[in-house]
């Protein structure tokens, strides 16, 4: 691992500690930092390029085979997306945003995490229903108190 990547990984860990209010964050087996946003499984990843970058990505829906109808739907979603990229890869609908380490701070990382997680959560159930897939996590049902109605 390059010195630049080690520095960036340390910086990302510190930002995630601040975001999640914990004293230590733990990377998964791939070296990414997982989190959940509704029905979406999300990760923060430090990319080991010549110039390291940070990618925030999510699985919105899984088990969805590629089709012309799916790609047309994803194109429509992508055209409305402001700060996230939506694409299909290996039977999964992915949402991601890549960040430069220059100027990376708590605010910019939080924006990326909320944008990616929010889009993935917003589109996951719809796409899973339309294309016979599933979301990484089940939808959280809100219990309705019948006496309150």
What kind of region is each of these model predictions?
Residues 35-38, 42-58:
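Short, well-structured hydrophobic secondary-structure segments
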Residues 1-41, 85-88, 138, 149:
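Charge-rich, low-complexity N-terminal segments
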Residues 2, 6, 64, 68, ...:
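Ordered, soluble secondary-structure elements with a strong preference for glycine-centered loop motifs
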Residues 9-23, 50-68:
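Charged, low-complexity, helix/coiled-coil-prone segments
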Residues 73-82, 101-131:
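Ampiphathic alpha-helical segments that act as solvent-exposed interaction surfaces
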Residues 34, 87-99, 136-142:
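A short beta-strand-loop-alpha-helix capping motif that often carries His-Thr
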Residues 127-149:
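Short, highly charged C-terminal tails/helix-capping segments
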């Amino acid at each position: 691992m390059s010195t630049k990547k080690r520095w960036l990984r340390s910086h990302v860990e510190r930002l995630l500690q601040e975001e999640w209010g914990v004293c230590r964050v733990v990377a998964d087996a791939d070296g990414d930092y997982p989190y959940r946003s509704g029905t979406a499984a999300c990760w923060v990843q430090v990319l080991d390029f010549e110039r390291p970058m940070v990618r925030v990505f999510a699985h919105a829906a899984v088990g969805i085979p590629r089709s012309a109808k799916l790609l047309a739907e994803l194109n429509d979603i992508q055209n409305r997306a402001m700060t996230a990229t939506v694409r299909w890869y290996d039977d999964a609908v992915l949402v991601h945003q890549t960040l430069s380490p220059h100027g990376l701070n708590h605010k910019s990382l939080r924006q990326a995490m909320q944008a990616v997680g929010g889009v993935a959560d917003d589109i996951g159930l719809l796409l899973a229903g339309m294309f016979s897939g599933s979301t990484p996590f089940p939808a959280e049902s809100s219990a309705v108190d019948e006496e309150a109605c």
